[in-house]
Amino acid sequence: MHRSLKIFGTLTSIGMVIVLMQGALVTKTESGEGCGATWPLCFGEVIPTNPAIETIIEYSHRIVSGLLGAMVIILAIWAWRKLSHIRETKVMAILAVLFIIFQGLLGAGAVVFGQSHAILALHFGISAISLATVVLLTTLAFEDGKPNPPALIVKKGYKGYILAVFAYCYAVIYTGAYVKHTQATLACGDFPLCNGQWIPMLSGPVGAHFFHRVAGTLLLILLVVALIWTLRKYSHYRSLVWTHILCVILVLTQYATGISIVLTGNELFVAMMHALIVSILFTTLCYIVMILSRNKAV
Protein backbone atom coordinates (compact mmCIF):
# COMPACT_ATOMS: atom_id res chain seq x y z
CA MET A 1 0.00 0.00 0.00
CA HIS A 2 1.23 3.52 -0.90
CA ARG A 3 4.43 2.10 -2.41
CA SER A 4 5.27 5.21 -4.42
CA LEU A 5 4.52 7.48 -1.47
CA LYS A 6 6.77 5.39 0.77
CA ILE A 7 9.63 5.58 -1.72
CA PHE A 8 9.22 9.31 -2.23
CA GLY A 9 8.95 9.92 1.51
CA THR A 10 12.09 7.89 2.14
CA LEU A 11 14.02 9.80 -0.52
CA THR A 12 12.77 13.11 0.89
CA SER A 13 13.81 12.07 4.40
CA ILE A 14 17.30 11.17 3.18
CA GLY A 15 17.43 14.46 1.31
CA MET A 16 16.52 16.38 4.46
CA VAL A 17 19.39 14.69 6.28
CA ILE A 18 21.71 15.83 3.49
CA VAL A 19 20.40 19.40 3.78
CA LEU A 20 20.90 19.35 7.53
CA MET A 21 24.46 18.05 7.15
CA GLN A 22 25.20 20.65 4.48
CA GLY A 23 23.98 23.34 6.84
CA ALA A 24 26.26 22.02 9.56
CA LEU A 25 29.14 22.04 7.06
CA VAL A 26 28.39 25.66 6.11
CA THR A 27 28.53 26.64 9.78
CA LYS A 28 31.64 24.59 10.55
CA THR A 29 33.59 25.95 7.56
CA GLU A 30 32.22 29.49 7.99
CA SER A 31 30.94 29.42 4.41
CA GLY A 32 27.74 31.37 5.10
CA GLU A 33 29.13 34.38 3.22
CA GLY A 34 30.46 32.25 0.37
CA CYS A 35 28.04 33.92 -2.05
CA GLY A 36 28.31 37.39 -0.61
CA ALA A 37 25.11 39.18 0.39
CA THR A 38 23.09 38.07 -2.66
CA TRP A 39 20.25 35.55 -2.66
CA PRO A 40 19.07 33.41 -4.44
CA LEU A 41 21.90 34.19 -6.89
CA CYS A 42 25.55 33.84 -5.93
CA PHE A 43 27.46 37.11 -6.35
CA GLY A 44 24.68 38.04 -8.77
CA GLU A 45 25.34 35.01 -10.98
CA VAL A 46 23.32 31.86 -11.62
CA ILE A 47 26.57 29.88 -11.88
CA PRO A 48 29.43 31.61 -10.05
CA THR A 49 32.70 31.90 -11.97
CA ASN A 50 35.92 30.63 -10.42
CA PRO A 51 34.19 29.78 -7.13
CA ALA A 52 36.16 29.38 -3.92
CA ILE A 53 35.51 26.29 -1.79
CA GLU A 54 33.32 28.38 0.54
CA THR A 55 31.23 29.45 -2.45
CA ILE A 56 30.79 25.85 -3.59
CA ILE A 57 29.71 24.76 -0.10
CA GLU A 58 27.22 27.60 0.34
CA TYR A 59 25.73 27.52 -3.18
CA SER A 60 25.36 23.74 -3.27
CA HIS A 61 23.54 23.99 0.07
CA ARG A 62 21.15 26.53 -1.45
CA ILE A 63 20.48 24.38 -4.53
CA VAL A 64 19.85 21.18 -2.57
CA SER A 65 17.72 23.06 -0.04
CA GLY A 66 15.57 24.49 -2.83
CA LEU A 67 15.08 21.07 -4.38
CA LEU A 68 14.18 19.53 -1.03
CA GLY A 69 11.81 22.38 -0.29
CA ALA A 70 9.83 21.45 -3.39
CA MET A 71 9.96 17.76 -2.47
CA VAL A 72 8.65 18.44 1.04
CA ILE A 73 5.70 20.40 -0.34
CA ILE A 74 4.92 17.59 -2.80
CA LEU A 75 5.17 15.02 0.01
CA ALA A 76 2.84 17.05 2.22
CA ILE A 77 0.19 17.36 -0.51
CA TRP A 78 0.54 13.70 -1.45
CA ALA A 79 0.24 12.53 2.15
CA TRP A 80 -2.75 14.85 2.72
CA ARG A 81 -4.55 13.23 -0.22
CA LYS A 82 -3.65 9.61 0.52
CA LEU A 83 -3.44 9.54 4.32
CA SER A 84 -6.05 12.09 5.40
CA HIS A 85 -7.89 9.37 7.34
CA ILE A 86 -4.95 9.21 9.78
CA ARG A 87 -5.30 11.75 12.56
CA GLU A 88 -1.72 13.03 12.53
CA THR A 89 -1.39 13.48 8.76
CA LYS A 90 -2.82 16.96 8.30
CA VAL A 91 -0.96 18.40 11.27
CA MET A 92 2.35 16.93 10.10
CA ALA A 93 1.76 18.05 6.51
CA ILE A 94 1.05 21.62 7.59
CA LEU A 95 4.05 21.70 9.92
CA ALA A 96 6.33 20.24 7.24
CA VAL A 97 5.42 22.99 4.76
CA LEU A 98 5.50 25.82 7.32
CA PHE A 99 8.87 24.87 8.76
CA ILE A 100 10.57 24.23 5.42
CA ILE A 101 9.45 27.71 4.30
CA PHE A 102 10.52 29.25 7.61
CA GLN A 103 13.86 27.47 7.34
CA GLY A 104 14.42 28.89 3.86
CA LEU A 105 13.47 32.41 4.92
CA LEU A 106 15.84 32.29 7.88
CA GLY A 107 18.66 31.14 5.63
CA ALA A 108 17.97 33.83 3.04
CA GLY A 109 17.62 36.49 5.72
CA ALA A 110 20.95 35.52 7.25
CA VAL A 111 22.66 36.04 3.88
CA VAL A 112 20.98 39.26 2.80
CA PHE A 113 20.47 41.08 6.09
CA GLY A 114 22.75 39.28 8.52
CA GLN A 115 21.40 37.87 11.76
CA SER A 116 22.30 37.70 15.41
CA HIS A 117 23.87 34.55 16.80
CA ALA A 118 20.58 33.74 18.53
CA ILE A 119 18.65 33.77 15.24
CA LEU A 120 21.35 31.81 13.41
CA ALA A 121 21.18 29.13 16.11
CA LEU A 122 17.42 28.94 15.59
CA HIS A 123 18.05 28.01 11.94
CA PHE A 124 19.51 24.64 12.97
CA GLY A 125 16.64 24.04 15.38
CA ILE A 126 14.12 24.66 12.61
CA SER A 127 16.05 22.24 10.40
CA ALA A 128 15.67 19.54 13.06
CA ILE A 129 11.91 20.10 13.19
CA SER A 130 11.67 20.00 9.39
CA LEU A 131 13.49 16.67 9.30
CA ALA A 132 11.25 15.25 12.02
CA THR A 133 8.00 16.22 10.29
CA VAL A 134 9.13 14.68 7.00
CA VAL A 135 10.20 11.44 8.69
CA LEU A 136 6.92 11.22 10.61
CA LEU A 137 4.88 11.76 7.45
CA THR A 138 6.83 8.94 5.82
CA THR A 139 6.31 6.77 8.89
CA LEU A 140 2.55 7.27 8.64
CA ALA A 141 2.65 5.95 5.08
CA PHE A 142 4.43 2.81 6.31
CA GLU A 143 2.00 2.37 9.23
CA ASP A 144 -1.16 2.73 7.14
CA GLY A 145 -2.85 -0.59 6.53
CA LYS A 146 -1.12 -2.37 9.38
CA PRO A 147 -3.58 -4.12 11.73
CA ASN A 148 -2.27 -2.61 14.96
CA PRO A 149 -0.49 0.73 14.65
CA PRO A 150 1.06 1.78 17.97
CA ALA A 151 -1.62 3.16 20.34
CA LEU A 152 -0.55 3.21 23.96
CA ILE A 153 -2.28 3.56 27.32
CA VAL A 154 0.03 5.22 29.83
CA LYS A 155 -0.19 7.25 33.02
CA LYS A 156 -0.49 11.03 32.83
CA GLY A 157 2.72 11.46 34.82
CA TYR A 158 4.69 9.35 32.36
CA LYS A 159 3.26 11.15 29.36
CA GLY A 160 3.98 14.54 30.93
CA TYR A 161 7.55 13.50 31.68
CA ILE A 162 8.18 12.41 28.09
CA LEU A 163 6.73 15.67 26.77
CA ALA A 164 9.00 17.62 29.11
CA VAL A 165 12.07 15.65 27.96
CA PHE A 166 11.04 16.23 24.34
CA ALA A 167 10.83 20.00 24.88
CA TYR A 168 14.07 20.00 26.84
CA CYS A 169 15.86 18.11 24.05
CA TYR A 170 14.94 20.90 21.64
CA ALA A 171 16.32 23.46 24.07
CA VAL A 172 19.60 21.52 24.25
CA ILE A 173 19.77 21.48 20.44
CA TYR A 174 19.43 25.25 20.48
CA THR A 175 22.22 25.67 23.05
CA GLY A 176 24.51 23.52 20.92
CA ALA A 177 23.80 25.56 17.81
CA TYR A 178 24.36 28.75 19.80
CA VAL A 179 27.77 27.46 20.91
CA LYS A 180 28.73 26.86 17.27
CA HIS A 181 27.61 30.27 16.05
CA THR A 182 29.32 32.15 18.89
CA GLN A 183 32.63 30.36 18.18
CA ALA A 184 32.50 28.82 21.67
CA THR A 185 33.06 25.21 20.56
CA LEU A 186 36.57 25.08 22.02
CA ALA A 187 36.07 27.66 24.76
CA CYS A 188 36.62 24.80 27.21
CA GLY A 189 39.76 23.10 25.98
CA ASP A 190 39.60 19.96 28.08
CA PHE A 191 37.16 17.43 29.53
CA PRO A 192 35.67 16.78 32.07
CA LEU A 193 37.21 19.98 33.43
CA CYS A 194 36.76 23.31 31.67
CA ASN A 195 40.14 24.96 31.31
CA GLY A 196 41.30 23.15 34.44
CA GLN A 197 38.25 24.10 36.51
CA TRP A 198 35.14 22.19 37.52
CA ILE A 199 33.08 25.38 37.46
CA PRO A 200 34.63 28.09 35.25
CA MET A 201 33.66 31.73 34.84
CA LEU A 202 30.07 31.60 33.59
CA SER A 203 30.26 34.42 31.06
CA GLY A 204 31.10 34.85 27.39
CA PRO A 205 32.03 31.86 25.20
CA VAL A 206 33.20 29.80 28.20
CA GLY A 207 29.85 30.27 29.91
CA ALA A 208 27.94 29.28 26.77
CA HIS A 209 30.09 26.17 26.28
CA PHE A 210 29.86 25.09 29.92
CA PHE A 211 26.10 25.63 30.01
CA HIS A 212 25.71 23.36 26.96
CA ARG A 213 27.81 20.68 28.66
CA VAL A 214 25.61 20.76 31.75
CA ALA A 215 22.44 20.79 29.63
CA GLY A 216 23.66 17.79 27.61
CA THR A 217 24.55 15.84 30.74
CA LEU A 218 21.09 16.48 32.18
CA LEU A 219 19.49 15.30 28.92
CA LEU A 220 21.46 12.05 29.18
CA ILE A 221 20.20 11.52 32.73
CA LEU A 222 16.59 12.34 31.79
CA LEU A 223 16.60 9.85 28.91
CA VAL A 224 18.10 7.08 31.05
CA VAL A 225 15.35 7.71 33.62
CA ALA A 226 12.75 7.56 30.82
CA LEU A 227 14.14 4.20 29.66
CA ILE A 228 14.10 2.74 33.18
CA TRP A 229 10.53 3.98 33.70
CA THR A 230 9.47 2.46 30.39
CA LEU A 231 11.09 -0.90 31.13
CA ARG A 232 9.52 -1.07 34.59
CA LYS A 233 5.98 0.00 33.69
CA TYR A 234 5.47 -0.40 29.95
CA SER A 235 7.74 -3.22 28.80
CA HIS A 236 4.73 -4.80 27.02
CA TYR A 237 4.75 -1.93 24.49
CA ARG A 238 7.57 -2.95 22.16
CA SER A 239 7.46 0.26 20.13
CA LEU A 240 7.92 2.30 23.31
CA VAL A 241 10.72 0.12 24.66
CA TRP A 242 12.78 0.02 21.48
CA THR A 243 12.45 3.73 20.74
CA HIS A 244 13.62 4.55 24.26
CA ILE A 245 16.56 2.16 23.92
CA LEU A 246 17.42 3.91 20.65
CA CYS A 247 17.20 7.30 22.39
CA VAL A 248 19.66 6.25 25.08
CA ILE A 249 22.07 4.80 22.50
CA LEU A 250 21.84 8.02 20.50
CA VAL A 251 22.32 10.34 23.48
CA LEU A 252 25.33 8.30 24.66
CA THR A 253 26.82 8.51 21.16
CA GLN A 254 26.00 12.21 21.07
CA TYR A 255 27.74 12.71 24.40
CA ALA A 256 30.80 10.83 23.13
CA THR A 257 31.01 12.93 19.96
CA GLY A 258 30.67 16.08 22.04
CA ILE A 259 33.66 15.04 24.13
CA SER A 260 35.54 14.09 20.96
CA ILE A 261 34.96 17.54 19.48
CA VAL A 262 36.87 19.04 22.40
CA LEU A 263 39.63 16.44 22.43
CA THR A 264 40.18 16.52 18.63
CA GLY A 265 40.09 20.29 18.32
CA ASN A 266 36.70 20.33 16.57
CA GLU A 267 37.56 17.83 13.83
CA LEU A 268 35.15 18.17 10.90
CA PHE A 269 33.78 14.60 10.74
CA VAL A 270 33.15 14.46 14.49
CA ALA A 271 31.36 17.83 14.43
CA MET A 272 29.16 16.68 11.53
CA MET A 273 28.25 13.47 13.37
CA HIS A 274 27.39 15.51 16.46
CA ALA A 275 24.85 17.50 14.44
CA LEU A 276 23.43 14.42 12.72
CA ILE A 277 22.99 12.28 15.83
CA VAL A 278 21.11 14.91 17.82
CA SER A 279 18.75 15.42 14.88
CA ILE A 280 18.00 11.68 14.75
CA LEU A 281 17.49 11.72 18.53
CA PHE A 282 15.01 14.58 18.26
CA THR A 283 13.16 12.80 15.44
CA THR A 284 12.90 9.64 17.56
CA LEU A 285 11.48 11.64 20.45
CA CYS A 286 8.97 13.22 18.05
CA TYR A 287 7.81 9.73 17.09
CA ILE A 288 7.44 8.74 20.74
CA VAL A 289 5.35 11.85 21.41
CA MET A 290 3.20 11.08 18.37
CA ILE A 291 2.36 7.52 19.43
CA LEU A 292 1.74 8.63 23.02
CA SER A 293 -0.76 11.20 21.77
CA ARG A 294 -2.95 8.56 20.13
CA ASN A 295 -4.64 7.51 23.36
CA LYS A 296 -5.63 9.57 26.37
CA ALA A 297 -3.41 9.12 29.40
CA VAL A 298 -5.08 7.57 32.46
From Swiss-Prot:
An annotated Gene Ontology molecular function: metal ion binding
Transmembrane segments: 7-27, 63-83, 93-113, 118-138, 159-179, 210-230, 245-265, 272-292
This protein's GO CC annotations: plasma membrane
Documented EC number(s): 1.17.99.9
Reactions catalysed according to its record: Fe(II)-heme o + 2 A + H2O = Fe(II)-heme a + 2 AH2
CC cofactor: heme b
Enzyme active site: 58
Disulfides per UniProt: 35-42, 188-194
Positions in the Extracellular compartment: 28-62, 114-117, 180-209, 266-271
GO BP field: heme A biosynthetic process
Quaternary assembly: Interacts with CtaB.
Family: Belongs to the COX15/CtaA family. Type 1 subfamily.
Name of this protein: Heme A synthase
